[in-house]
Amino acid sequence: MSFFRGTFSTSSLFINTVDSVTKRFATKKSAGSTKNGRTSQPKNLGLKKSGNQLVYPGEIIIRQRGTEFHPGTFVGMGKDHTIFSKTIGLVSFSKEPKFPGSKKTRRFISVAPLYTNNININTNIDTSIDTNVNNNNSNINI
């Protein structure tokens, strides 16, 4: 038993028991960081004007991602696919086939203008008042 002599002593046994009694461990695990604690800014997508509603030039009709709605007459499309009015008028929605004979349809947004700029007024110029005026009927485009 000389091999085990000195390995066990009363002092070493006493210290080990005291260490095991006095050691403390965390009773609650510390919280880790999360990657989900933020939100993105709202994009405010969707319809801004409905059917038969009055719009003015430059007013946004719909904000969208991709071409869910396609631009029709008197309507423009921005680089982010926002559809806006080009004239004063009423908004209208329609469905048309993608190509003739197709079952798939596309939705279009158009604006029916209230005013047209192509008004022809025919006037007869009286040449008896001034001698320098030619004897012609003139069409004036306003």
Curated annotation (Swiss-Prot):
Comp. bias regions, Polar residues: 30-43
Region Disordered, annotated ranges: 27-48
Keyword field contains Ligase: no
Single GO MF annotation: structural constituent of ribosome
GO biological process: translation
Cell compartments where the protein resides: Mitochondrion
Cellular component aspect of the GO annotation: mitochondrial large ribosomal subunit
Segments crossing the lipid bilayer: none
UniProt family annotation: Belongs to the bacterial ribosomal protein bL27 family.
Name of the protein described by the UniProt record: Large ribosomal subunit protein bL27m
Source organism of the structure: Dictyostelium discoideum
Gene, per the UniProt record: mrpl27
